[in-house]
């Protein structure tokens, strides 16, 4: 029976079904299509209390960041968040958060918050009306000064934002605060981009450039601090820990990670944060705290630079009659051991057990870039038929963009799928994690077996974790199994996540570090003279290369591309930074210089870092920015 379960593949056509790999699928989708996908997602995914508008808004902001079209983001964002002037969507976000956190605002506070939402909507609508009047003087009366309208709106934002930071309700109100901050920062960006057309003076322009930097700092730090305070208080199962994190990333950090990039234009953000999903089965009873998270996080991320092809392992399917001649039986499904497989013959360490013969293999069949995994089923549970017949089931199943399903057992229970996200990695945990593992995060690409402590009852068990992100501009698979990043065909800039390297020397002293105010996570170098190589498929365009780094202490960065070496000496962001305290990193964007991505060839990009003694260094983002567009500050 086990072989039948593992060989059966059902072809199912879903909304995300595609036939060929489109590396720029996000850019090619209309906002209407994205909005419909999130609405469909909400109908099918009732286990996570996330309103679909949060995914739509994040996609809208990323699209605007990657475009030069439209300088009035605030007007369009207002129509998304307050359709037809209604505050219902924002109230829905609050209600969903109340359900998720099992916390409610008292009656007076709820009335106050709803009044603030109504006032915020009215303020934004009135400001947009005044701008329209200014730009169309023949149609309506012209306001005395658009600068006066701008400054009034700025003060109104400051007054209202504070109302979503009320003592005792900071976490509950954080998703609403993030949406209000989206509006405020979009407003400031609009003022800067439209300064000439709106007749804004040079002095006022400088003021709003400072506002964009300062409020990006303040709002980012507030969101990070509020989340981390709550996360540090967790003492719960892995599923609940990951679900809390996913909820906050979709509702808050998808935006926070964009804010620090608002100073750029025409930048395709192809890096991004990960969402993690695991099962909610009764067998996984081990409790975790924030002190365990550095290890868990490193386990889920350790091979993120490789192109995933599937996983294989040993599964068990047994049925035993009840003892003593009693009627009925007990059936058990169990994943005993697993390994994750990547292109190029790369595999992870074993998860669960190590001395079992493989009896299933789950892969994408077609090339993994053409049919990536997008959905997972990871639950487990028990079914009872009558009094004496019990089935203890487990799933650990996945589905590709073409609708093919495979895994250890048959899909059932809640699935994990997010519109626009791909499963770019699979990881997992044993029934019980060893203390020696929990205290020792994995280094970059480390291959470590993850097993329960010796003698653990039922310890030879594996439970998978799916890793979802939006990374899709992958041109091909490098010969060593890693990603080759694809540059856009037009003059749009793009980003590369530092964790998606082709290779890194000094691997045992290189770690992946979680970040919140940055599009994706960082590579932390703990040894001097470390070099990370990235491979990109060029288009012949020139770019200004910016490296987002945190260097607490002095460092020297040398970048080599097309045989040319660029050097940034005495880099130190201890005090010279953007002000965001991002999980211990204080970053600044360093302009390395003008580089060329050679046309139709795979271009190596080497980043070498020399550290002074004691320097803490994070490589946080690699940004290739159009040469004809300067940052807004």
UniProtKB/Swiss-Prot annotation:
Q: What are the GO MF terms of this UniProt record?
A: signaling receptor binding; toxin activity
Q: Which GO terms describe its biological process?
A: sporulation resulting in formation of a cellular spore; symbiont-mediated killing of host cell
- Work out whether the entry's keyword set contains RNA-binding: no
Q: Read off the Pfam families from this record.
A: Endotoxin_C, Endotoxin_mid, Endotoxin_N
On whether Plastid is a keyword of this UniProt record, the answer is no
Its keywords, alphabetically, are: Sporulation, Toxin, Virulence
Tell me the Gene3D superfamilies matching this sequence: Galactose-binding domain-like (2.60.120.260), Pesticidal crystal protein, central domain (2.100.10.10), Pesticidal crystal protein, N-terminal domain (1.20.190.10)
> What does the protein in this record do?
Promotes colloidosmotic lysis by binding to the midgut epithelial cells of insects.
Q: What else is known?
A: Toxic segment of the protein is located in the N-terminus.
Q: Per the similarity annotation, which family is this?
A: Belongs to the delta endotoxin family.
Protein name according to UniProt: Pesticidal crystal protein Cry2Ad
Originating organism: Bacillus thuringiensis
User: Which gene name does the record give?
Assistant: cry2Ad
């Amino acid at each position: 029976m086990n072989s039948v379960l593992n060989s059966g593949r059902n072809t199912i056509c879903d909304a995300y079904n595609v036939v060929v790999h489109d590396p720029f699928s996000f850019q090619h989708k209309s906002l209407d299509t994205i909005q419909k996908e999130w609405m469909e997602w909400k109908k099918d995914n009732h286990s996570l209390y996330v309103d679909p508008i949060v995914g739509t808004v994040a996609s809208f902001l990323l699209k605007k960041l990657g475009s030069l079209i439209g300088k009035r983001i605030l007007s369009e964002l207002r129509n998304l968040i307050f359709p037809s002037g209604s505050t219902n969507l924002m109230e829905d976000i609050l209600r969903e958060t109340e359900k998720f956190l099992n916390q409610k605002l008292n009656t007076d506070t709820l009335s106050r918050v709803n009044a603030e939402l109504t006032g915020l909507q009215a303020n934004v609508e009135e400001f947009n009306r005044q701008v329209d009047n200014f730009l169309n003087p023949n149609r309506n009366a012209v306001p005395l000064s658009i600068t006066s309208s701008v400054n009034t709106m700025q003060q109104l934002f400051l007054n209202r934002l504070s109302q979503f930071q009320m003592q005792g309700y900071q976490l509950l109100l954080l998703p609403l605060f993030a949406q209000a901050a989206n509006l405020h920062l979009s407003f400031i960006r609009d003022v800067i981009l439209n300064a000439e057309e709106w007749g804004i003076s040079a002095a006022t322009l400088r003021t709003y450039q400072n506002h964009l930097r300062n409020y990006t700092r303040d709002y980012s730090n507030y969101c990070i601090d509020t989340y981390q305070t709550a996360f540090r208080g967790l003492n719960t199962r892995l599923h609940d820990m990951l679900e809390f994190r996913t909820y906050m990333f979709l509702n808050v950090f998808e935006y926070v990670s964009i804010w620090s990039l608002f100073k750029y234009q025409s930048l395709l953000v192809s890096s991004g944060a990960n969402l993690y999903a695991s099962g909610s089965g009764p067998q996984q009873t081990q409790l975790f705290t924030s002190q365990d998270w550095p290890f868990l996080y490193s386990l889920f991320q350790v091979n993120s630079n490789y192109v995933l092809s599937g996983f294989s392992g040993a599964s068990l399917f047994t049925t035993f009659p009840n003892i003593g001649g009693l009627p009925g039986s007990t059936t058990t499904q169990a994943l005993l051991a697993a390994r994750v497989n990547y292109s190029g013959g790369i595999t992870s360490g074993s998860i669960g057990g190590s001395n079992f013969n493989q009896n299933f293999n789950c892969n994408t069949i077609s090339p993994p870039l053409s049919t990536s995994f997008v959905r997972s089923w990871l639950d487990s549970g028990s079914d009872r038929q009558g009094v004496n017949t019990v089935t203890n089931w487990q799933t650990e199943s996945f589905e590709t963009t073409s609708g093919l399903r495979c895994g250890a057992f048959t899909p059932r229970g809640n699935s994990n799928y997010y519109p626009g996200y791909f499963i770019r990695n699979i990881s997992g945990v044993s029934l019980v994690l060893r203390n020696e593992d929990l205290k020792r995060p994995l280094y970059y690409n480390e291959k470590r077996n993850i097993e329960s402590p010796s003698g653990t009852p039922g310890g030879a068990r594996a439970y998978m974790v799916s890793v979802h992100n939006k990374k899709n501009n992958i041109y091909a698979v490098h010969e060593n199994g890693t990603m080759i990043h694809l540059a856009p065909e037009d003059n749009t800039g793009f980003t590369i996540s530092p964790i998606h390297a082709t290779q890194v020397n000094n691997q045992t002293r290189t770690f992946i570090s979680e970040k919140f105010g940055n599009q994706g996570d960082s590579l932390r170098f703990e040894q001097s003279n470390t070099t990370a190589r990235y491979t990109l498929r060029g288009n012949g365009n020139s770019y200004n290369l910016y490296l987002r780094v945190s260097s607490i202490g002095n460092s020297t960065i040398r970048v080599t591309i097309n045989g040319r070496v660029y050097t940034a000496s005495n880099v130190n962001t201890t005090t010279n930074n953007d002000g965001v305290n991002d999980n211990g990193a204080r970053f600044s964007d360093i302009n390395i210089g003008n580089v060329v991505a050679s046309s139709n060839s795979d271009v190596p990009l080497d980043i070498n870092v020399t550290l002074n003694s004691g320097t803490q260094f994070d490589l946080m983002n690699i940004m290739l920015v159009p040469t004809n567009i300067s940052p807004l500050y």
